[in-house]
Structure formats: structure tokens, C-alpha cells
């Protein structure tokens, strides 16, 4: 499976879990900048939804990387996805609500998710472009 196929497969799974919540998936960082390097890069992802993620959705999403690794043994990409999933409102306002975090140190359900300033600038520019 190629990097592009892995991203599409993961995106399809996320959309399936968040059905009815109108998820928008953003890939940013080295993949978006065409600078992905196997063994060095991760796959930065932000998933923004119309409404707060439900407890059941969060429970499914928090373990999705592991599920995908079990389904596709030996795939080098699924463990590299890192980022957050939360409502667009919580992302923009910083309000506390259920969020899913995937990172190098593991994954968890939390009450917020913040991205680094470079990723934030890139994502806000994309949001601005998408809404104007």
C-alpha cells in the first residue's frame, strides 16, 4: 500500500466512524508540503466535525490506528498518523469538549486539542481559502 492509499484508507475509516457529523479531514505538515520522508516523517492530521464527537465515536477513534495495523499487518504508515479530532467550534474557540489525540506517546481521549503554530497557520489558511 502506498502512502496515498494509506491516507485514503484511514480517511475513509474516520469518515465512517464520524458518519452524520460531517467530518472534514486536513493533512498538513511534510505530507502536504511534499516533503514526507519514510523513517523520519509522520502524517499530520486534523479532523474537524460539525458537532462534538460522541463518546462512542471517540472510543472507536482512539484505537483506530491499532485496528488498522491489525487489519493491514506490516503497513508502515498507519502508526505514523498524528493529530487531533474535535469539532470545528472547539478548534477555533478553544472551548473544552471531547477530543481524540493521536501522537508519538500514544493516543487518548481528552477535553481539548491544540496544534503547533506552524500547523495552525497552515490549517487556518486552508480554512480561509475554503470559506471565501
Which residues make up each language-model segment?
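Conserved NTP/Mg2+-binding pocket subregion across the NTase superfamily
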Residues: 63-132
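Short helix-terminating capping/connector loops at secondary-structure junctions
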Residues: 19-21, 39, 74-79
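Generic, low-specificity signal for short hydrophobic/alpha-helical stretches with a mild N-terminal bias
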Residues: 7, 25-28, 43, 65, ...
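Catalytic metal-binding acidic patch
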Residues: 29, 34-60, 83
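Helical scaffold of the NTase/Pol beta-like nucleotidyltransferase catalytic core
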Residues: 1-26, 57-58
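Generic detector of bulky aromatic hydrophobic side chains
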Residues: 26, 36-39, 45, 87, ...
Amino acid at each position: 500500500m502506498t502512502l496515498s492509499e494509506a491516507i485514503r484508507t484511514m480517511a475513509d475509516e474516520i469518515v465512517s466512524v464520524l458518519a452524520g457529523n460531517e467530518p472534514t479531514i486536513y493533512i498538513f505538515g511534510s505530507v502536504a508540503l511534499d516533503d514526507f520522508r519514510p523513517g523520519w516523517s509522520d502524517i499530520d492530521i486534523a479532523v474537524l466535525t460539525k458537532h462534538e464527537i460522541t463518546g462512542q465515536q471517540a472510543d472507536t477513534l482512539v484505537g483506530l490506528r491499532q485496528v488498522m495495523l491489525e487489519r493491514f499487518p506490516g503497513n508502515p504508515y498507519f502508526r505514523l498518523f498524528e493529530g487531533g479530532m474535535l469539532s470545528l467550534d472547539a478548534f477555533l474557540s478553544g472551548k473544552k469538549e471531547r477530543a481524540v489525540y493521536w501522537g508519538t506517546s500514544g493516543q487518548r481521549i481528552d477535553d481539548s486539542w491544540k496544534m503547533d503554530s506552524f500547523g495552525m497557520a497552515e490549517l487556518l489558511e486552508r480554512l480561509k481559502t475554503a470559506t471565501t
